[in-house]
Amino acid sequence: MPHDGNERSHRIARLAAVVSGIAGLLLCGIVPLLPVNQTTATIFWPQGSTADGNITQITAPLVSGAPRALDISIPCSAIATLPANGGLVLSTLPAGGVDTGKAGLFVRANQDTVVVAFRDSVAAVAARSTIAAGGCSALHIWADTGGAGADFMGIPGGAGTLPPEKKPQVGGIFTDLKVGAQPGLSARVDIDTRFITTPGALKKAVMLLGVLAVLVAMVGLAALDRLSRGRTLRDWLTRYRPRVRVGFASRLADAAVIATLLLWHVIGATSSDDGYLLTVARVAPKAGYVANYYRYFGTTEAPFDWYTSVLAQLAAVSTAGVWMRLPATLAGIACWLIVSRFVLRRLGPGPGGLASNRVAVFTAGAVFLSAWLPFNNGLRPEPLIALGVLVTWVLVERSIALGRLAPAAVAIIVATLTATLAPQGLIALAPLLTGARAIAQRIRRRRATDGLLAPLAVLAAALSLITVVVFRDQTLATVAESARIKYKVGPTIAWYQDFLRYYFLTVESNVEGSMSRRFAVLVLLFCLFGVLFVLLRRGRVAGLASGPAWRLIGTTAVGLLLLTFTPTKWAVQFGAFAGLAGVLGAVTAFTFARIGLHSRRNLTLYVTALLFVLAWATSGINGWFYVGNYGVPWYDIQPVIASHPVTSMFLTLSILTGLLAAWYHFRMDYAGHTEVKDNRRNRILASTPLLVVAVIMVAGEVGSMAKAAVFRYPLYTTAKANLTALSTGLSSCAMADDVLAEPDPNAGMLQPVPGQAFGPDGPLGGISPVGFKPEGVGEDLKSDPVVSKPGLVNSDASPNKPNAAITDSAGTAGGKGPVGINGSHAALPFGLDPARTPVMGSYGENNLAATATSAWYQLPPRSPDRPLVVVSAAGAIWSYKEDGDFIYGQSLKLQWGVTGPDGRIQPLGQVFPIDIGPQPAWRNLRFPLAWAPPEADVARIVAYDPNLSPEQWFAFTPPRVPVLESLQRLIGSATPVLMDIATAANFPCQRPFSEHLGIAELPQYRILPDHKQTAASSNLWQSSSTGGPFLFTQALLRTSTIATYLRGDWYRDWGSVEQYHRLVPADQAPDAVVEEGVITVPGWGRPGPIRALP
């Protein structure tokens, strides 16, 4: 009877596994094809009227650029009302935007004709005389998936069509027509809202049933596992309860690793994509889906959106960086605990094994930290991928060790969840691939009792469960369209060019190839190939489990192979290997200790290789992303000690030890075997080199950030922002509290001391300027190109050569403006009023030395909110950096003075300006009032330009002492802002402009990073041609730059702030009213491709 009962239980469990597994597979498999509820959005025009009864314009910037469909009808009688010189009949973008003719629909009338053009391609033309004579009834314009066209109805030859790629961008409807709403005058814009979908009742039910079926199937498989071993449930639970004995070494390593991770959480640099992911998460709830905010025409982030959805929930609590980065730090702690508690014990259990070797445990912690800190302290998915890879490996090993298949099913679920974190999450499949043979053998052994169908059905069902996550609110068609656009827009690099990923690590003066990142990858590769060499040569190492060790090597190697199939090749993706690196570090220390004891030559070669790794790593800069560089030593150069490069020191040591190893090698022919005596001292010497090297690197990284945090305080750093957030209950505003802005630069303009004499050029020119004149300003003030290195994240420039790009803050690149107070025609920057701001410059003076000394200007009383004397200037100006290096140019100094009792002014010292550049564009020279003698109450400009070169000139405006206020006070938390990728995470209180129903809210400000980052990344990644926010900001808005400074850090180019102004004011073109609806669409339905062309 017991035997019959066991067989009956086996049959029931097998039947449950088969039926539930197949049901789960089918139910989950059809999820991508099930119908969803799609929100529709349509704009009808005209909307409202002006006070005199005429139609109004409307503003509606579409996130996708082009609409799904467009249909416009304009009575020819309305067109005939335009004046004789013509005008704008209708357009979908303002005429004054950047290259709007190349993107929009424009119907223009001149004296003779009316022309309909889509993206600068003419579709139809009609003579105005024919229209005025009543030769046509209406102009019909349309654009949809079939094409674009126009028809002057009633005029022979007045119709024309264009291909679908001419579908215009829509930012609203704009017109010069002065007519009222009337029959036949209409426009309909169907917005492409294909990604704004929610699951219907059917899809919800199928997903729920599918998940339940898979869970039941896995329970059935677990029951088969139990029954196949002939134990009762109680025996099974007792037998497989984990027994983990933690020694002192493990506890000490735990404390050190976790303490370092927690410290790094506060003081460590963040990743390059923190702002990207934070902004996407913040706008997702209102957008209705996880939309790509900065690129790709607003497509969904699916199938890699579930992690961003989690971030959106965190952002609903607080957007402070110290809060948002909790998942990364918790993942790091979890990774280490898994390594120390499970992985090391699996690789070397028992006395004398790897897990009981103190140095191996310490080495695992040090190598893990050296691989984790440079990559995984941000919102990027690599920390969770590293955790997912380790969990998958542990589950696969548990399945193999215990002969159970249920852990393998769980491993499949974990691996697929990890794979959908990001494309590089594909490496989570590596443990499954390397363990597949052993699992398949287990299935074959149990075939007689379990059959093949039961385990295979459950494993397949576990694999299919990922469709519920990926397609929970999207469909197969929308995810496919999103992928198409991303591959169309790029950047993508072919799999066979994956070597570029490693090349990026070697590029000099590149943050992506910094010292810490080079070391992490070099150590990973060193450990991988080192252990592989030892195992191939020796076969087995005492204390190391051979099977798990080989599968660890296979997991790492296959993971690196799978990484080649990712479309991007950013070096930061190596962070996904941090957990494996730590484990390999322990195995390397353990195995090399054995071969080191065997031979002095081998031990010396081991040390030589590690010294060479250090030499190669320290040939890179100690650079970190953006704000992470603030106050860090050697952030832009190779580390040096006593003026000697550290890389040269390690290379020299490596050469010396290499020569010593060669001597040991040749000495073997004469002295025989050179085995090292097996005592405690030698065992320590043989096992600690990797530990020492990794500790040096970790100490350098943590020490660099700690030094920046301590020695720069109270100046802004990431550490200061995090500590302030913690002390204020996450309510501080990080960089927005420390960036100071000039709300009105004209208000701070200094006034000349009364009673002074000066020439016809006014007080700024002084008594008799030579060579300086109001018109002495060049028209073209574009700065020199910024050359960025290959491999820069969020840059779509060439991946294999340096890239040059030009960018300047709005209004700083020169040009002509209205006539100023002293006759200058220069266009002034930063909101300076030409009616109150004179200009003097030496441009064009190529015959003699130019000189000018301005009149004395009265300084205001000292106050904390007025710390600077500021001079707006252009051209080439001599200045000194904070480290003492000079920037070549001509001399512009500020001279302090003091007014005596008799009213006479006594000159005091002169100072060069702080000039953050770039030359020759307009910028604000800074003279901290802390530099002024305490008695100084006046100041004047002393200008001298003896260089006759056409490039060596400069221009300047009067000094001002502006009242500064924080950016948080100026912008606040309610104003919509475009925060560039690099800056968004540093301004948690500012609100990113929202997207709703496929329409973008127009921002009022833009926060940019430093000049180089803007040129190399922001302006390329966010461009209109790639579907970024410039798609509508450049078409609908004009910009001006606000003068800003980083509190107390006057030498710092922290970035800039631009203010947006609508080309067509909101009272003339209010935001469109959108009619919303809901339709049901099948999972395979595709309303044509989204236009994703330049």
Swiss-Prot record:
It is a multi-pass membrane protein. Its main location: membrane. Keywords: Antibiotic resistance, Cell membrane, Cell wall biogenesis/degradation, Glycosyltransferase, Membrane, Transferase, Transmembrane, Transmembrane helix. This is one of the target of the anti-tuberculosis drug ethambutol [(S,S')-2,2'-(ethylenediimino)di-1-butanol; EMB]. EMB is a first-line drug used to treat tuberculosis. EMB inhibits the transfer of arabinogalactan into the cell wall. Belongs to the emb family. Induction: Positively regulated by the transcriptional regulatory protein EmbR. Changing residue 833 to A: Resistance to EMB. The gene is embA. The chain crosses the membrane at residues 12-34, 205-224, 247-269, 322-344, 356-375, 408-430, 451-470, 519-536, 543-565, 575-597, 604-626, 641-663, 684-706. Its EC number is 2.4.2.-. GO terms for molecular function: arabinosyltransferase activity. This is Probable arabinosyltransferase A. It is found in: Cell membrane. The keyword Transmembrane helix applies. GO terms for cellular component: cytosol; plasma membrane. It comes from Mycobacterium tuberculosis (strain ATCC 25618 / H37Rv). It comes from the Bacteria. Arabinosyl transferase responsible for the polymerization of arabinose into the arabinan of arabinogalactan. One of its GO terms (biological process) is response to antibiotic.
